[in-house]
């Protein structure tokens, strides 16, 4: 990711419609798995934690720690007062079976994650048997645009690709859904225009307040929907998976 993107993220993550909406969906999915809220003995790793905003919010469910390869991201984590350490998803700096849960948001698609299977395998390694994995990745090649270039994307996924990626590393998929469904026509149109007009740069930024409110509200509706059904199309894919209590099976192939 371009270094300037971390500053934009830090300024936008708490209130900007996309970040706030994606966080609402993540919190909804976690609350569905942990309806009783926090547990003192629950350790949660955010793999590829960026500037650490999610770590602050996930404290309601347990003790959080982040890992990120970027020193710039870790600097922002320190300014938030959240625990984070330097490391790669391809070689996580934690012992086996360290965490009851791992989250990872828009990380596996990065160009520096050379093999997403190895990254998932590392996450499975540090999860305890019965542990939970919540992952989000960008969806659908048709939505590729200037933002993907700005954040060094390698791939956009289908729901089926995410299922295969997780199951091939021995995880049991409990929930699998697209998200950013209600705004999909808007996003698809914007990305098409970006390509036609050769626009460059990231999508991170604030819209006029009425649009910010509307878009956040629509994603808030999706946050409630995804607890009960799988949305059929969208700009992101969310999955909730568990490591079998007997331990994940060996990867196939």
Features from the language model and the residues they span:
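Conserved N-terminal segment of class I S-adenosyl-L-methionine
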Residues: 1-97, 101-105, 120, 234-237, ...
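Short N-terminal helix/helix-N-cap motif within the alpha/beta-hydrolase-1
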Residues: 56, 112-116, 145
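Short catalytic micro-motifs in class I SAM-dependent methyltransferases
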Residues: 106-110
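Conserved S-adenosyl-L-methionine
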Residues: 171-181
């Amino acid at each position: 990711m371009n270094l300037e993107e971390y500053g934009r993220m830090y300024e936008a993550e708490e209130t900007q419609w996309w970040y706030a909406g994606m966080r609402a969906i993540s919190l909804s999915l976690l609350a569905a798995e942990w309806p009783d809220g926090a547990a003192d003995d629950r350790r949660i790793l955010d793999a590829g934690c960026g500037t650490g905003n999610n770590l602050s919010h996930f404290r309601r469910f347990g003790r959080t720690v982040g890992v990120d390869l970027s020193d710039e991201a870790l600097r922002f984590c320190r300014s938030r007062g959240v625990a984070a350490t330097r490391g790669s998803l391809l070689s996580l700096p934690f012992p086996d079976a360290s965490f009851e849960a791992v989250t990872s948001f828009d990380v596996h698609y990065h160009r520096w994650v050379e093999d997403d299977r190895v990254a998932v395998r590392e996450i499975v390694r540090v999860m305890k048997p019965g542990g939970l994995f919540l992952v989000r990745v960008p969806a659908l090649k048709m939505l590729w645009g200037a933002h993907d270039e700005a954040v060094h994307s390698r791939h956009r996924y289908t729901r089926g690709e995410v299922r295969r990626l997780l199951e091939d590393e021995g995880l049991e998929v409990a929930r699998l859904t697209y998200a950013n469904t209600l705004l999909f026509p808007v996003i698809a149109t914007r990305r098409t225009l970006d390509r036609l007009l050769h626009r460059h740069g990231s999508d991170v930024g604030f819209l006029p307040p009425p649009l910010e409110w509307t878009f956040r509200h629509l994603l808030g509706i999706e946050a409630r929907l995804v607890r009960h059904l799988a949305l059929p199309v969208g700009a992101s894919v969310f999955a909730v998976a568990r490591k079998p209590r007997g331990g994940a099976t060996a990867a196939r192939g």
